[in-house]
Structure formats: C-alpha cells, structure tokens
Amino acid sequence: MICFDVLHPYYLPQYLPVMQELQARGQVVRFVIYRSQDQQAALDALVAQNGLEAHWVDSQEEALAYYLKEKPSWVIFGNSFDAAAKLKGICKTALMQHGIGPKACYYTVSESDMDVRFVEGEYRLKRLQQLFPHKTFIDTGYAKLDPIVQGSEAGLDLEALGLDPAKPTLLYAPTFYPSSIEKMAKDWPSAFSEYNILLKPHYFSLSKPSYKKQKQLLEHWGNFDNVYLAPVEQANLLPFMASADLLISDASSALFEFAALDKPVVWCDFYHLRWSYRGILSFRFKNRMDEDLYRYAGVAAHAASYKELKAVVDQQIAQPESFAAKRAEYTLELAGRVDGHSSQRIVDYLLSEEAS
C-alpha cells in the first residue's frame, strides 16, 4: 500500500496523476486526509469526484499513528511533516511539493526529514543539492500538468457555465497573500466585457474568515454575466487552465504552471500588503518571496497597476507568442520536462529496486 498525506485539498491535483499510474500498475493507494472546518466541503467533493479510498484524521499525531500501524511501503507528502523521522524503518517517505512557484518555502520545506524529494527540472535539482547535500532528490518533472499535456483533461463546458464559447477566456487565479484582489477595480469585469472571465482564487480566499473581504469582492464579481466564480468545492485548477487562453495572476505557482503550457500570462505587480509587511518591515515580504521571483519575471507580461491591466491583456491576446521563448526557457528550469510522463517517472522510482 502507498499512502498520500493530504493536509490541504490543493495537494490532490498533484497526487491524482501519480495515483492513476500506481493503480494502473496494480498498487493499492490510500489517501490520509485531514478533516477541516474551513475545507471540509472541498475535501468531501474531491473524494467523491475521484473515488478516493480515504482514511480521515484530525491531526498529524493521528496520521502518524495510522502510518505506524498500517506500515505502508511509501507515504507521499505535499509539505513538511514534523514526525517524518519517526517513520524511519517503518516506511519510506517522499515529498512532492504542491507548487512550483517562487516562494522561499519551496526550498525550506526540504529541511523536513524525508527519504526522497521529487523535483522539477535540473536547475532546482542542483540548487536543492547545494542547500541539502546529504539528501536525495530525483528530477521527475511536475506531475500535476500530466493530464493537460496528455489530453485527458478536457476542460470546462463554458456554455454550461453561462459563458460565450466564441469569446476569448481569461483565467484570474490570484493567490491569497500577497494578493492583487484588493487592488482590482470593484467592477473590473465590465471593463473586460469582450472576454469570458474564470475566477479561480486560492481556496483560503473563499474559506478563511481572515480573508472575508476577498470573498466579498470575488462573490460580487461572480454576479457579472461574463464571469464564472469557481466554488470552493471545485478545487482543481487544471480544468480552468485547460479552458483559458490567458492567465492573470500574482506571484503564484499557477503563473508558472500556466506558462509551462505555453500560454500567455499577465503578472500583476500590484498587491495588497499588510501593515506588518510595509515600510521598514518590508524585509518580511522579501523573506516570504524567493530570489527566483525576480529571476523569472520575464516569463510574463507585467501590469504595474490595475490601470495598465486591460492594455496588457489585450496585447497578449493579440500576440500570444510574444513571450514564448522565455516561457520555454524558464519552464525547463522551473517545471523540468513537460512531456506528460512525470507521474510515470515518479512511479518508476517508487517501485524500483533503487528505492527499496
């Protein structure tokens, strides 16, 4: 048996292609999922939609007790796990980080005591090996994108969502912090009336009480005729990425995932910062973001303010190939090979003699 540790719903799109590959090779797969007051609706929907064999827990302590009792051959994590060292000699542990974006946590998560980490591309492999020379890293690519590359992800039925299939489709997928949501015009969809707009925020923006102002704005925008707001239960970004012609986002993993599909991206350089991240405390913001944020800025067209956004979007829709060379260059470094076979490489390793 191989277990996937699901602390948050957004880990699942990274896990599912690997699950399918494991099941195709006759492996038993189980998902250890953490109950959550804020996220339970999304979790229940994902379990039902994907027919997952789930074991529910309330804490890391319960998850650890389950792993110690069941002794799976592997436990795959989407983030650090404080008790990973206690699984030594019981089962193997692997890390599949749930995003490929520029936040510093992409690297610091490897401080966790995992047996192996699957990584995306040679640049990040080398950098992680420099930071953690005694740990094992395997370059497999980014499994989350496999269904789109393979063509098995059909996308959304725009007409069924009340949108016009004849219009170009924009995907606005902001992260929760730092976010551009609060800096957008209150009625911005009306200024983009010639486009369909898919709103796919981070689920924190719709479920966490501390982000209720973001939720109010998103729900307001969802009332426009040319807009579809994904409910929190619709947790998988992939159908939205498959259906969109252009992505609008801030410094998020989604930005790099979309660019890896060779589609145009507009990067919002305007975002709302908490007081604790401004002025002389701006070092906190810099610590939250990785130097890769600036290294890879050329992957997208940039809008310095909301006022610039419409013109930048129009230009990228008219000339979608204008950043194609940079997208290809940076995708190779950030996502590695985008060939639809990342999950196969991960499973090859999990079932190999090298890993046993």
Task: For each feature predicted by the language model, list its residue ranges.
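Active-site and donor-binding regions of nucleotide-sugar-utilizing enzymes
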Residues: 3-151
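A nucleotide-sugar donor-handling region in carbohydrate enzymes
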Residues: 113-182, 206-207, 322-329
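Catalytic binding pocket for nucleotide-activated donors in carbohydrate/polymer assembly enzymes
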Residues: 131, 139, 253-330, 334
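Donor-nucleotide binding loops and adjacent catalytic segments primarily
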Residues: 164-243
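C-terminal alpha-helical cap of glycosyltransferases
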Residues: 338-356
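Short hydrophobic segments within beta-strands
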Residues: 5, 32, 96, 171-173, ...
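Short acidic-hydrophobic, aromatic-tinged amphipathic segments that line or gate anion-handling sites
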Residues: 53-59, 228-232, 298-309
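A donor-sugar binding/catalytic signature common to diverse glycosyltransferases
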Residues: 76-77, 89-95, 233-281
